[in-house]
Amino acid sequence: MKVLVINAGSSSLKYQLIDMINESPLAVGLCERVGIDNSIITQKRFDGKKLEKQVDLPTHRVALEEVVKALTDPEFGVITDMGEINAVGHRVVHGGEKFTTSALFDAGVEEAIRDCFDLAPLHNPPNMMGISACAEIMPGTPMVIVFDTAFHQTMPAYAYMYALPYDLYEKYGVRKYGFHGTSHKYVAGRAALMLGKPIEDTKIITCHLGNGSSIAAVKGGKSIDTSMGFTPLEGVAMGTRCGSIDPAVVPFVMDKESLSSREVDTLMNKKSGVLGVSGISNDFRDLDEAASHGNERAELALEIFAYSVKRVIGEYLAVLNGADAIVFTAGIGENSASIRKRILTGLEGLGIKIDEEKNKIRGQEIDISTPDSSIRVFVIPTNEELAIARETKEIVETEAKLRKSVPV
């Protein structure tokens, strides 16, 4: 089976074509600047051969048409026609409370995705554009929707409810949803294998640390708490997001700076985090460099980030009553030894000890804890595309079996 995985953003369309026989990508591509001038498509084949083309991409549909051309290109492509693709898996950020698992796309699923536009106005609409384009260009090919929020729907009510008037939840769905669920689920599964234990018997803290960061407490393979909330703004400090702050800061700053609700939202989402504190960058590599040359605000930004992650790890050790493993994943979690060290230093009293030399290894699956560490510390590269492809394959094959078992 070949599965096309699509992640449609507001001005981008990422894709991978994965051969599920050996779970390897045949092609990885990206359409950039969709709906903007100077748009481009790049595609890298399994053998390293690369296509790069500047082409007008006014809509997601046109972008997907270019993806079809790239995948079937006589020189750079990997298939002869789109009929070789057995299924399509789409990443959708928000599934609300309706979806606890991935779902085969139909009219009801489309309606539910649209119902969540208010909850994820920056993400669900472009996600839906990608789905609609795919339905037009590849009619008859089954599509599976994999929701970022689904994995966290196992949280108990006392973990996901806010102490606000209950009717705000009933009327508007105001509660914690959590995000990065596909990544948290994938690395928790890998961690269980590294522990050599059935996932049902594990307690794992997963740290997805990138420009957007979230942490999850995973017990028996199920999310029981996570740091992001109603939106991806809650939780730890991030690249450009402030993370959790005293809510009273919002009206105070609005009054003092004469900001609208939209402007203060932009301030907290786009101008805060380590960028806002440092005044330099949201790229942690730039901050590391600046801090090493004595920039105090860069150092402060890194310390705020590391402390916020450390604090949540401590919370989740209490929530889980201990842990078998702590996992670091995503761009920063996988590649920044210095950030991992900042986060874990001072946790030795909780049985968390890392090997300095192993911690220097970047971007590969490894146990970086010492032999006497009572809690294992793993670095596990995430693979959300493969996770989406696996879910897609499973759902499509299950649906096919069900159809065969129904008498005509």
From Swiss-Prot:
Catalytic activity, EC: 2.7.2.1
Cell location: Cytoplasm
Domain of life: Archaea
Binding-site residues for substrate, renumbered to this chain: 91
One cellular-component annotation, GO: cytoplasm
Catalysed reactions, semicolon-separated: acetate + ATP = acetyl phosphate + ADP
Keywords, sorted A to Z: ATP-binding, Cytoplasm, Kinase, Magnesium, Metal-binding, Nucleotide-binding, Transferase
PROSITE patterns assigned to the protein according to its UniProt record, in alphabetical order: ACETATE_KINASE_1, ACETATE_KINASE_2
A Pfam family reported for this protein in Swiss-Prot or TrEMBL: Acetate_kinase
Active site as annotated: 148
Cofactor note as given: Mg(2+). Can also accept Mn(2+).
Binding site for ATP: 14, 208-212, 283-285, 331-335
Biological pathway: Metabolic intermediate biosynthesis; acetyl-CoA biosynthesis; acetyl-CoA from acetate: step 1/2
GO molecular function, one term: ATP binding
Cofactor: Mg(2+); Mn(2+)
A biological process term (GO) from this entry: acetyl-CoA biosynthetic process
Database matches in InterPro entries: Ac/propionate_kinase (IPR004372), Aliphatic_acid_kin_short-chain (IPR000890), Aliphatic_acid_kinase_CS (IPR023865), ATPase_NBD (IPR043129)
Binding site for Mg(2+): 7, 384
UniProt-annotated site: Transition state stabilizer, residues: 180, 241
Function text: Catalyzes the formation of acetyl phosphate from acetate and ATP. Can also catalyze the reverse reaction.
PANTHER family for this protein: ACETATE KINASE (PTHR21060), ACETATE KINASE-RELATED (PTHR21060:SF15)
Subunit note: Homodimer.
NCBIfam families associated with the record: ackA
Family statement drawn from the similarity comment of this UniProt entry: Belongs to the acetokinase family.
Full protein name: Acetate kinase
Natural source organism: Methanosarcina barkeri (strain Fusaro / DSM 804)
